[in-house]
Amino acid sequence: MKQTEKIEIEIGQKLNSYVLSLMESDGKLLIAHEKLGYSYFGQLSTVDIGKYQEEAGLKDYDGMRRGDYIKGYISQIRRFHFHDTGRRSPFTADSHIVNDAYRMYEHGENLAAILYRIQREKPMAYRRIIRVIQSVAPYFSDFYFQPTEADMVRLQWQDKYSSMIYGPTDLSDGTIRFIALTVLFMQPWLPRVIIIDEPELGLHPVAIEKLSGLIKMAAQKGTQVIVATQSAELISNFEPEDVLTVNQNEDGTTINRLNSEELAHWLEDYTLGDLWKQNIMKGGQPR
């Protein structure tokens, strides 16, 4: 199997860019080259901020405002993973209504605090979240918040047919995941970049369709959403250019973006997911 000698990462945002080259040295990952890019009178210019070092120099670089811009951009990249839904899952954790309410955590452990803040500060957004949840779980009525004297709150809810108060473990795995995904993509304080792994796990087909709409809505608001998925149903709700396939062989890993023109004839009768399952579109198949 061929080994990659160098990995290069480039982040571009309007007139600013950040490039990081990684290489192996004595069994360790080493930063071979690090630089900032900017536009100067219409010409692309770069400045080196680090070479052959173990840690990135961007966080300590104060040489230009663009460095602060890129640092701010990178700091708003968030990754999420809502797979754990057991009796001791992150969704069962208590969270502080102030300290834990600034941004959603990676595994959803502060979901209650985020929802409580949205309810108090953005009631219209909160009501929209409730309606989307009800479109998948019609029995769901509302969340129930009862902060303690220590300003801690836990995720609780009510259904339409009972006065009982339920917890997250009283929801199916797919429903609690869908609730977390709904809050993630409908929150008023969206991060610039959301990275999420297999959000379709355990979701009803109707919920998968709703999820695709939530992803598109967040993207329309300026958030870049990067999703790793194995769901043919999910990608069927997107355009070919929205989908990148990742393939690995003896020459390494390649990433290819699908092309509408190449698939136009097939898409007249089949969905994008159908083409994936039938191995008609390029890539994305186990080898």
What kind of region is each of these model predictions?
Residues 6, 150-154, 250-252:
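A generic structural signal for beta-strand entry/edge sites
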Residues 8-135, 141-144:
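Electropositive, glycine-dotted interaction segments
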Residues 13-15, 24, 161, 189, ...:
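A generic beta-sheet turn/junction motif
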Residues 124-127, 131-186, 196-209:
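Conserved ABC ATPase signature
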Residues 192-193:
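The start of beta-strands in P-loop NTPase/AAA+ ATPase cores
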